[in-house]
Amino acid sequence: MAKASKETFYLGNKNLPAPETNFQWNEVMIEDLERARKSILHFSRFFYIVNLDEGKQPIKLYNYQKRILKALTDNRFNVVLASRQIGKTTILTIFALWMICFQDDYRVLLIANKEATAINIFKRIRLAYEMLPNFLKPGVINYAKTGLELANGSSIGISTTTSDAARGESINCVTGESVVTVRDKITGKILKMPIREVANIL
């Protein structure tokens, strides 16, 4: 962790620098900051996940995950056709965290069918933010269970997939689960649900 020359941290948490926290910089820190700002792949080297067997550890990206990250940074709109459980949500959390750290006034909205799911995804981002070296992240203005606001004006919030989700809000990046339409053969009723829930009813 970078040594702060002023002991100012959000709620006393040493992993949450306040906007006025200053650091004693060295050449390696300056180089890492610049490289992380320019390259999401370099930034991802500092991104931590929780491995079920080994606990907290830096993520090790597969080549296809690197390609997705590059596509996210190179293109405004992206559609990813992929199987389940290959780390798509993790990739989106890396992208969201990178953007709010290095873009001013950038707004991310995490959408899921249930609030608990959105909160769980946001917990991953909170963990990754806390595990970043302090010199890589803007200071914290607000740090809550359902949202994060940084000193550079960027923020992340959560929402459920309701008909009026985020209505009237200005959002730069929206991430969410894939939703499919399924017709019940017996009743004829049409259901909309996340892909991950389809397997549960088959």
Regions from the PLM with identified roles:
Residues 2-176, 182-201:
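Phosphate/NTP-binding elements of NTP-utilizing enzymes
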